[in-house]
Amino acid sequence: MPYLEPYLKKRIDSKLQQLQSLRPLSYASVVKLKEQFRIEMTYNSNAIEGNKLTLKETFLVINEGLTIKGKSLKDHLEAKDHYEALNYLYEFVEKDSLHTVSEVFLRNLQQLVVRETDPDWAGRYRIGDVIITGSDHIPPDANSVPYLMNDLIKWVRNNKRKMHSIELAAIFHHRIVFIHPFFDGNGRTARLAMNLILMQKGYPLVVMLKNDRKRYYDSLVKADRGDYLPFIRFTAQAVERSLNMYLKTLLPESKTKEKYYPLSEISNKTPYSEKYLNLLIRQGKIEAHKEKRNWLTSIEAVERYIKGRMRRRKIPTKT
């Protein structure tokens, strides 16, 4: 049975509660954060699939309508399409925060994701078999796709109150890419659709980073084999990153005292090497977030891990 590790669950639940306690949130701050996340997710989700636009170029294409020299038309169209799909997601949640996941919602999302790059198959399930380049996974026969998608939606509805929303969202994400219901846009659609479940529970938009692409795909492969824990952990850490960014912006300065540093600096001030800190972070045991390719954490986060470890071993702390 997949599960969210207790220490990670406790940390995330606490941060979500902290964010909820700040409501009503500053309108100006939320608008700014949402726009930042829209651009960031559009860039990262497309880049995971091979889009060549940089983060800055993605911003310029969407907000300034610029054409980037040396980048393909497809790269430009994918950025615009994904941004529109994100707008649809936000509007969907804001219009009815309790709306249940449905096949219509998924098909509408995918239709927007590939509207300009694959218009003939936008919003339609595939009718032929497909091979995923670079993957050993062979998606189910095309004839079974409608039945599998119907079963998936029923599964989500049946488990909505039985599972933690992060577990539910992660497994839902995996099942979409496993079934591969569309000819194109499956990964981007799955990353968007997962967010419906999370945003309905009050989480900010969750972005899976291009720099974590290998870990993302490795954990999906393990989920293909029935081991969901790595992908649930990966998803949870992405959730925590979004919560951290919101809290950092919205909390009063006096309540955000922790400063985050690269692991090379933290290792000089704590008992652990940079390599071991990296391992603990990847396991979700120490709170951290990524900036570009580097993990950042705080001395306080390491100290909390040490104290928790001592309590579990029933070793008294110094007074």
Regions found by a protein language model. Name each.
Residues 1-184, 188-319:
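FIC/Doc superfamily catalytic core
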